[in-house]
C-alpha cells in the first residue's frame, strides 16, 4: 500500500524531528463496504487500521496520521439517484475536502491522531 510506503519513508524522519502530520485520502467505503467495490472496501479498511497502528507507534514523537473518508465529490459525476440518497442532496467539493485536510495538518489539530473523518453530506449510516 502506498500509505505504508510513504509512512515508512517519512515517519522516521518526522520522529527524529519530533513533529509531523500525514493525512490519507481514502473513501467512506472504509466504514460502509460496498458489494460493487469489494477489494477497494477491504483495502480502505486496512488503511484505517494502519493509521491507528501508526498513531500508536509514533504518537510519542508528536507524529500524527489521520484519514479523510470522502463520499461523492463533484470532481466525479454521480447520477441523480445517488445524489438523492445524500441527506444534503448534493455532492461535496474538492475545496471542502481540502479544508478538512488543511485543518488536520495544522497545529490546531495537534491532539488528533489515528482517526477517520467522514465527509459525505450525511450519507454514511455507520456509527
What positions do the PLM features span?
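A short, exposed helix-loop element centered on a Lys and neighboring polar residues
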Residues: 7-8, 52
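Alpha-helical segment proximal to the catalytic Tyr-Lys
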Residues: 12, 56-57, 110
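A short hydrophobic alpha-helix cap/turn motif
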Residues: 15-16, 58-60, 73, 105
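Catalytic loop of short-chain dehydrogenase/reductase
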Residues: 23-46, 51-60
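Short C-terminal tail/terminal secondary-structure segment
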Residues: 32, 102, 113-127
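Short, small/polar-rich loop/turn modules that mediate ligand/substrate recognition or access, typified
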Residues: 59, 64, 112-114
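Conserved SDR Rossmann-fold cofactor-binding beta-strand/turn motif
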Residues: 64-74, 105, 118-120
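A conserved structural motif in NAD(P)-dependent oxidoreductases
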Residues: 86-97, 108
Amino acid at each position: 500500500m502506498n500509505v505504508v510506503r510513504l509512512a515508512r519513508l517519512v515517519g522516521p524522519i518526522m520522529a527524529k524531528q519530533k513533529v509531523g502530520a500525514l493525512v490519507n485520502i481514502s473513501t467512506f467505503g472504509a466504514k460502509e463496504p460496498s458489494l460493487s467495490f469489494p477489494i477497494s472496501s477491504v483495502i480502505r479498511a486496512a488503511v484505517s487500521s494502519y493509521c491507528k497502528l501508526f498513531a500508536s507507534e509514533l504518537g510519542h514523537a508528536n507524529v500524527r496520521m489521520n484519514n479523510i473518508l470522502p463520499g461523492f465529490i463533484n470532481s466525479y459525476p454521480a447520477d441523480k439517484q445517488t445524489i438523492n440518497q445524500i441527506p444534503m442532496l448534493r455532492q461535496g467539493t474538492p475545496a471542502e475536502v481540502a479544508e478538512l485536510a488543511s485543518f488536520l495538518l495544522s497545529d490546531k489539530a495537534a491532539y488528533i491522531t489515528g482517526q477517520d473523518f467522514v465527509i459525505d453530506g450525511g450519507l454514511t449510516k455507520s456509527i
